[in-house]
Amino acid sequence: MEKVIELKNVDKHFGTNHVLNKISLTINSGQLVGLIGPSGAGKSTLIAAMLGMLRLDGGQVRLLNSDMPNRSALQNIGYMAQNDALYGNLTGLENLSFFGKLMGLSRSVLTDKIHLVSQTVDLQDHLDLRVSQYSGGMKRRLSLAIALLSDAPLLILDEPTVGIDPELRIKIWQELDKLHQQGKTVLITTNVMSEIETVDRLLMLRDGHIIADNTPTFLEKQYQVTNIESVFIKAGERYENNSHI
């Protein structure tokens, strides 16, 4: 199975804060992977490290067989940041068109893709509004739509369902599962424990360490609980106990 993401001893400090502590992991093609952790655990920093957006203090990152940072490799990644990078003076449609052209999509393909992704995130009736008039949740949905525009083999989505109502979250996860079934690799961070049950593989990050890595079902059996929220609590307690030994 092809390795899509490879991290070897990835290390990062911000001053005296050890944000990523020699993290090593491999994500293979076609996997749907969830990354969870408390606020400040290092999730967004780990994503930034994967994408070559920050200078590491140690370790190596490879994405799609390319050493990072690598600008050309980024063209094969659909990325949604935690902070929306949108043009407020443009409409939703103009934002989608602009980013789609940057991805190299032809006009005919782009038209079809915009129709599809705007329906997926339920923005089809709001594309003519300036983004400055969008609510926070609408901006998140537009950012997700932009990430879904490309036919990239790898999607990295940093908390894409924050501020989105439960019904639409279900629809978005159905779309992500469809892309996963098509063979795409999807890495998603979230704090919504209930929606992470459907992933192939769950990573739990705490204090810059991966403290759990397996399927949700395996982890629930390992910790003798019935939901991921309880796994999260139990794994955290075990980590805290071991770290003080």
Pin down the residues of each PLM region.
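Catalytic Walker B motif of ABC-type/P-loop ATPase nucleotide-binding domains
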Residues: 155-159
